[in-house]
Amino acid sequence: MFPNVDLMHEGDTYKLGFAGGGLTRPLNPKLRNSEPRQIWMQEQGIDVQINGGWLDSFGYELSPDEGLAWSRFLNEHLIAATKGKDNLRALGTVPLQNGEKAARLLEELMDEGLAGVMIGTQPNGNHGNLDAPELDPFWAVASDRKAVVFIHPMYGCGDIRLNDYDMINAVGRGLDTTTAVARILYAGHFTRYPGMSVVLPHGGGALPWMLGRLHHNVVIHPDQYADPLEGFSHIYFDTVVFDPDALKFLIAKAGVDKVMLGSDYPFPIGDHTPKVVVKAAGLSEIDTKAIFGETAAKLFKLEDSCVGQH
């Protein structure tokens, strides 16, 4: 069915390969079994979780046609895994290596009732830019259908200096997000495609802290790029920053109505007690409720105000 997708299965270890490239990291067993997730959610007092796929499995390296078929395959199984579970909701995936096919599949997913999709920062797997003109059809549909687009960094951003000290996760993810989203800010995507809602994990990487510098770049190069300050106001962020002061800074820059509880479950670098950092920030009861679920309930069109997170 998928001639350019390889599966390595040894014991309880699964790895994927695409288009003759190297194998992915091992698939975390907790991504395949929802029972530990359900137990963890109950322990943490989480009512509803928004689930995207695993970026390593998205297959952006495949040809457009095979990539479309692979994305449909992933979506079918993700939707099936969350069907009948009121506390799990799915974000789909699209073949970002081709803007027209990504747009077509996004239309299908929205017709099926999904709130939106999770996409990677590099539309060709280990390279590419989200502001590439060939992706305009995807962004146009995202805006027209008022889709949620969760932008997640890829594994590594091509800098070999990150190969030591486990810095691919600690540093590289944030750099990848910052670079990718800075490009669509400068490209004016939030003005051109105002109907979509973009969500960033890990507190947006370095983006909130570099916003002043990004804006100053426009000041010294007038009339060349869109002002990032304008687009930034339309972005949502999660709370996976691990530090109460960092969270308070994020809220000050983005607004409390743009911040939602996140976890990065089940990955080791995720925040497995996600409410702790929010409570430690000393926010008002109203703001805490917004972060714990009210904002997510509105954004993802959940029936009740509840605790939603990724």
Feature map (PLM): residue ranges:
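Helix-coil boundary/capping segments in enzymes
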Residues: 1-310
